[in-house]
């Protein structure tokens, strides 16, 4: 278990449909129930002693506006995900009513692939904050070199920034593509409430593992949990699914910090108590 210090602000996570539509208090109360445990890894990811240099782009650029200085430190590329690490130094006049969260827009090769935006703030001192963001995407381009346009356009969910902090970054996903393991599946399972799902694939990188699945109709009950088990008896539970389209028919379920390096595993749909809901699926690395 990794314990986080008391100066870490709460974590919030927004999907594309929710951004800017809900009041701050409602958003925090509702979303924290869903994502605090998983998004807390944003801090842990940079704090742990693991070599992610091959997937990281050092930036070190600073932009200024009336709110203060924002320095984009690093960008990490993952499967359908971009992770950002920035430092915020507020201006003396900047006195927020709430804790500070920034939700950047990230365009990839000029297009917006974002489906979910998570953030975490850590107060390093009274005048310095570390800002972490996880931007989840769908149908990410396969180019080895990507042009990222990163725009910090609003803070605390719905407050627009008059002069956004903007950064242009060239990032490589060449090594990520080499180290990524794909487990093609294309099998149907019955999940909670007898919802029929097509499990498309599992994708694993040194940073995270994601189960991709879809249904013919919009998924009503989102309590879609899975377990992946190794031959040696290890087991990991995936319990935070998120939609990949506005129709609610395409989904992903990601577990950060898990890298599936063996050739064979078993995937099992389970309920909240961990009980199996349908037959286990044997998955094999492509």
What are these regions (language model features)?
Residues 1-8:
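N-terminal targeting leaders characterized by basic, low-complexity, disordered sequences
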Residues 17-32:
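N-terminal Sec-pathway targeting helices
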Residues 8-13, 25-26, 37-286:
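Alpha-helical, hydrophobic structural elements that either
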């Amino acid at each position: 278990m990794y314990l986080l210090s008391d100066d870490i602000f709460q974590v919030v996570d927004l999907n594309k449909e929710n951004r800017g539509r809900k009041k701050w208090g409602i958003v925090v109360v509702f979303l924290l129930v869903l994502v605090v445990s998983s998004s807390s890894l944003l801090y842990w990811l940079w704090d742990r002693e693991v070599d992610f240099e091959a997937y990281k782009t050092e930036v070190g650029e600073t932009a200024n506006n009336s709110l203060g200085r924002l320095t984009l430190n690093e960008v990490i590329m993952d499967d359908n995900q971009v992770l950002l690490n920035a430092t915020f130094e507020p201006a003396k006049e900047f006195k927020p009513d709430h804790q500070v969260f920034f939700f950047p827009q990230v365009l990839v090769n000029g297009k917006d692939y974002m489906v979910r935006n998570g953030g975490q703030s850590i107060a390093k001192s009274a005048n310095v904050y570390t800002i972490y963001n996880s931007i989840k995407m769908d149908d990410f381009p396969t180019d080895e070199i990507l042009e990222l346009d990163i725009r910090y356009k609003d803070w605390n969910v719905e407050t627009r920034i008059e002069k956004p902090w903007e950064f242009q970054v060239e990032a490589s996903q060449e090594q990520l593509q080499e180290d990524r393991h794909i487990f093609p599946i294309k099998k149907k399972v019955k999940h909670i409430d007898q919802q029929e799902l097509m499990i498309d694939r599992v994708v694993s990188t040194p940073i995270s593992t994601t189960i991709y699945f879809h249904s013919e109709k919009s998924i009503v009950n989102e309590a879609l949990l899975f377990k992946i088990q190794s031959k040696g008896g290890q087991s990991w539970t995936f319990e935070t699914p998120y939609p990949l389209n506005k129709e609610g028919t395409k989904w992903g379920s990601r577990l950060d910090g898990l890298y599936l390096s063996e050739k064979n595993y078993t995937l099992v749909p389970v309920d909240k108590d961990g009980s199996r809901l349908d037959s286990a699926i044997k998955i094999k690395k492509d």
